[in-house]
Regions:
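Short hydrophobic/aromatic-enriched beta-strand-loop microsegments
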Residues: 75-78, 98-103, 187
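Short, surface-exposed amphipathic charged segments that create phosphate/polyanion-binding patches used
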Residues: 1-2, 193
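Divalent metal-binding pocket/active-site signature
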Residues: 2-95, 107-108, 115-116, 120, ...
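Conserved beta/loop motifs at nucleotide-recognition and modification sites
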Residues: 130
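Mid-to-C-terminal alpha-helical segments outside catalytic/metal-binding sites
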Residues: 147-193
């Protein structure tokens, strides 16, 4: 953890991670993953930087660790590339965390995920590409790229009943608030048609 904290002092480091639990691939033990996850949470708490959280097929254990660690002291975190269930998203929101969605939310069979996105407060949501993976419709199966994030934004804006421009403005504000080490003079909400 000391090395993570030391490296985080570099001016270009704006977050800790990605760290978390991945039970889809069984490359390391659950115990080892939990230990590493907790160390990253401690580093995020110590530095004040947001933690990018990876949670795949591990909602229950992720929620438990987040709740236990948050009880020890708050920290900023983003549930990156969110595809989990409603319970983990609700618990993250209750701890003032951000839930970030990718192109998966645009897929035909992702109605439950769109429902989760609709339930996340507007001031606690982000969109991302996770490029080169998870391209949104109509580019599913192709290499993802930053320009495609607008399709994810459009899908979530639609389920929230707001314009894409309103959604872009909100997510830009959320990004600036959470990633406060990023020079903000260059950030303007933009929707490219």
């Amino acid at each position: 953890m000391d090395e993570i904290v030391t490296l985080s002092n570099h001016p270009k480091v704006v977050a800790i991670g990605e760290a978390g639990l991945d039970y889809y691939y069984q490359h390391s033990s659950k115990e080892g993953q939990a230990e590493g996850f907790r160390r990253h949470i401690q580093a995020a708490r110590q530095t004040g930087l947001p933690l990018e959280i990876h949670a795949r097929d591990a909602d229950e254990d992720t929620a438990q660790i987040l709740e236990e660690e948050y009880a020890r002291g708050p920290f900023k975190a983003i549930l990156h590339c969110y595809t989990g269930g409603p319970e983990l998203a609700q618990k993250a929101v209750a701890m003032n965390m951000i839930v970030s969605f990718t192109g998966v939310v645009t897929f035909k069979k992702s109605e439950a995920l769109r429902d989760i996105a609709a339930s996340v407060p507007l001031d606690q949501i982000l969109v991302e590409t996770d490029a080169p993976y998870l391209a949104p419709m109509p580019f599913r199966g192709k290499t993802n790229e930053p320009a495609y994030v607008r399709y994810t934004a459009e899908a979530i804006a639609a389920v929230k009943g707001i314009t894409t421009e309103e959604f872009a403005a909100a997510t830009t504000q959320n990004f600036m608030r959470y990633f406060d080490k990023v020079p903000q003079s260059d950030l303007e909400p933009t929707v490219v048609a």
